[in-house]
């Protein structure tokens, strides 16, 4: 390949990781992003009033079982130990999530052992539901009406804007209960937070002489001719000017407020009742427990359907969306010299570790395709 110029659209984890891998192999990489900052939705910044590090687009906690990815991020940031312990306000009480032995004993006013709790939950479950088809049936089958209505029903309606009876059972993976006192929200081997924030980490990944970044810059289709390859991490439907219509997303609204002292005593407090309009309140200084701040910055988080001018967060991927997605995939699969990557480019919800793993794989695949004089695929991951 004589032309070693690469264009990357989007300066989130997908874009900068691919850029770094290719820059180290001698490619000249230009990253563009329509926003006025790098980092995508992982962007964080200091609040000028309190000096608290704020996760601008909502909380991002790094958790993975992938040692390669963990070692990768540790090259670019000092990762501090961090365990996500989520609380939930339900019926005037505060409980620990995920539902664990403490939650069960508190909720049912009992002192069950693990085996007794297992028997209790089994008894509460609706065994008449043999093959759960919906989120609601899955919850009723595994945890019963009381826990479902207290912790899942209202929260799910607020989060997805749909009744749990309309959502697929697959959203509620397996039995969402622990029969011990473990209240670590994640099960992953490696968990942490970058000491200086995600923005600094992403800046460090992008800090290479062969990488240039242009912000507040839209991608122009005619630019493709100037580059050997384009990696596009923007919305797939936007690339085609929404010609078949818009793929459905949920978006988030954040109501920011400051407080002197501690507002809620934890990083994340879920509000499970349908009567409370927000899904949760996050208190950002608790995401950096190694720091000390007198003031506090909190976000009330609201979920709703994503409009034309909103930031897309969660791909809906229901039946109608999947039919529309298929039309865009058919268009994309006829392209050459472009690869769609990341959450928006592949219309999939991705945690940060998966995003990084896929970006590393995509860069390797590109280098291999060049070495073997093969065509680089438009998608490097399953998207259907």
From Swiss-Prot:
<dbReference type="GO" id="GO:0050660">
    <property type="term" value="F:flavin adenine dinucleotide binding"/>
</dbReference>
<comment type="similarity">
    <text>Belongs to the UDP-galactopyranose/dTDP-fucopyranose mutase family.</text>
</comment>
<keyword id="KW-0413">Isomerase</keyword>
<feature type="binding site">
    <location>
        <position position="41"/>
    </location>
    <ligand>
        <name>FAD</name>
    </ligand>
</feature>
<feature type="binding site">
    <location>
        <position position="343"/>
    </location>
    <ligand>
        <name>FAD</name>
    </ligand>
</feature>
<feature type="signal peptide">
    <location>
        <begin position="1"/>
        <end position="19"/>
    </location>
</feature>
<comment type="pathway">
    <text>Bacterial outer membrane biogenesis; LPS O-antigen biosynthesis.</text>
</comment>
<keyword id="KW-0274">FAD</keyword>
<feature type="binding site">
    <location>
        <position position="14"/>
    </location>
    <ligand>
        <name>FAD</name>
    </ligand>
</feature>
<dbReference type="GO" id="GO:0009243">
    <property type="term" value="P:O antigen biosynthetic process"/>
</dbReference>
<feature type="binding site">
    <location>
        <position position="156"/>
    </location>
    <ligand>
        <name>UDP-alpha-D-galactose</name>
    </ligand>
</feature>
<keyword id="KW-0732">Signal</keyword>
<feature type="binding site">
    <location>
        <position position="280"/>
    </location>
    <ligand>
        <name>UDP-alpha-D-galactose</name>
    </ligand>
</feature>
<dbReference type="Pfam" id="PF13450">
    <property type="entry name" value="NAD_binding_8"/>
</dbReference>
<feature type="binding site">
    <location>
        <begin position="350"/>
        <end position="355"/>
    </location>
    <ligand>
        <name>FAD</name>
    </ligand>
</feature>
<feature type="binding site">
    <location>
        <position position="151"/>
    </location>
    <ligand>
        <name>UDP-alpha-D-galactose</name>
    </ligand>
</feature>
<dbReference type="InterPro" id="IPR004379">
    <property type="entry name" value="UDP-GALP_mutase"/>
</dbReference>
<protein>
    <recommendedName>
        <fullName>Probable UDP-galactopyranose mutase</fullName>
        <ecNumber>5.4.99.9</ecNumber>
    </recommendedName>
</protein>
<feature type="binding site">
    <location>
        <position position="185"/>
    </location>
    <ligand>
        <name>UDP-alpha-D-galactose</name>
    </ligand>
</feature>
<feature type="binding site">
    <location>
        <begin position="33"/>
        <end position="34"/>
    </location>
    <ligand>
        <name>FAD</name>
    </ligand>
</feature>
<feature type="binding site">
    <location>
        <position position="219"/>
    </location>
    <ligand>
        <name>FAD</name>
    </ligand>
</feature>
<comment type="subunit">
    <text>Homodimer.</text>
</comment>
<dbReference type="Pfam" id="PF03275">
    <property type="entry name" value="GLF"/>
</dbReference>
<comment type="function">
    <text>Catalyzes the interconversion through a 2-keto intermediate of uridine diphosphogalactopyranose (UDP-GalP) into uridine diphosphogalactofuranose (UDP-GalF).</text>
</comment>
<feature type="binding site">
    <location>
        <position position="270"/>
    </location>
    <ligand>
        <name>UDP-alpha-D-galactose</name>
    </ligand>
</feature>
<feature type="binding site">
    <location>
        <position position="84"/>
    </location>
    <ligand>
        <name>UDP-alpha-D-galactose</name>
    </ligand>
</feature>
<dbReference type="InterPro" id="IPR015899">
    <property type="entry name" value="UDP-GalPyranose_mutase_C"/>
</dbReference>
<dbReference type="GO" id="GO:0008767">
    <property type="term" value="F:UDP-galactopyranose mutase activity"/>
</dbReference>
<keyword id="KW-0448">Lipopolysaccharide biosynthesis</keyword>
<feature type="binding site">
    <location>
        <position position="160"/>
    </location>
    <ligand>
        <name>UDP-alpha-D-galactose</name>
    </ligand>
</feature>
<feature type="binding site">
    <location>
        <position position="349"/>
    </location>
    <ligand>
        <name>UDP-alpha-D-galactose</name>
    </ligand>
</feature>
<feature type="binding site">
    <location>
        <begin position="60"/>
        <end position="61"/>
    </location>
    <ligand>
        <name>FAD</name>
    </ligand>
</feature>
<keyword id="KW-0285">Flavoprotein</keyword>
<dbReference type="GO" id="GO:0005829">
    <property type="term" value="C:cytosol"/>
</dbReference>
<feature type="binding site">
    <location>
        <position position="314"/>
    </location>
    <ligand>
        <name>UDP-alpha-D-galactose</name>
    </ligand>
</feature>
